[in-house]
Amino acid sequence: MRSRETVTYSLVFLLILSIFSGIYGPEKVLELDEKNDVKIESISKSNNLIDIPSWKLNDKWNYNGYLDMVDFIVDSGVNTNLQTLTGTLESTVTDIYITTVDNSSSLVYKVESEGYYEANNINLDGQPGDLEVNMDTVSIIRASDLATVSQEATIDINFCRDFLWFCIDVSVGTLEVDQSYSPPLEGYDFPISVGEAWSQDYTATTTYSGSSDYVDIPEDTVSQRTANYEVVSQGFSGVNYASCATSYNISSSNADGEDTGYKWFLSLIHI
């Protein structure tokens, strides 16, 4: 029979996997460093349309935010008071080059990110402690429309279990997830304007690797998916940055109409 600790760490691993296996993008609530430097190439002169930004090498975004765990916990049935993981993410454009995307030569950006997320004083299946997640990601973004070609993430998961007046640091596991999209995932449809909606059918190919003493690494998958997007509003994003008053909220859902998230797009920077 597996020990209670083993069950707890297995649940931690599976919860983190459920979040990161499909989406690695920035969180729902973000703050940006005002040192961002992004050039805009305008296609339209209309004040009501936002066009494709042109990134430069070493462009950088700093995020503060959270990962919402509630829906995943409810679906899993895990007994825990964990609701969110809070932390930071720094993204940098590290390369710009031409590669083949769906049999066509395309200019792409390579964006590398480093993130750290934590939840302190939580209880997982009767085990109190702190949950820590370190994440490194690499995203390949098509320059012509900011569509995501592929994403890969390396995720280190640690649970510091409370014991008397100190805690025991347990390495729950390391997970590597590589995901590619065909055609590339079009989270934007430029030029952007309120009320615009679009859908996309695509194939997601996901490969897993890594190690854990508590749970098996998942099998690779190939799945057919549908993504629906809508620009639902324009206004203040909640981020304390000079240009955020004119942000565009882009919401997304799956083929069943279930909300899968939202993001903000700004005329000078995007989040």
What are these regions (language model features)?
Residues 90-101, 148-150, 226-231:
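A structural signal for short, hydrophobic beta-strand segments that form beta-sheets
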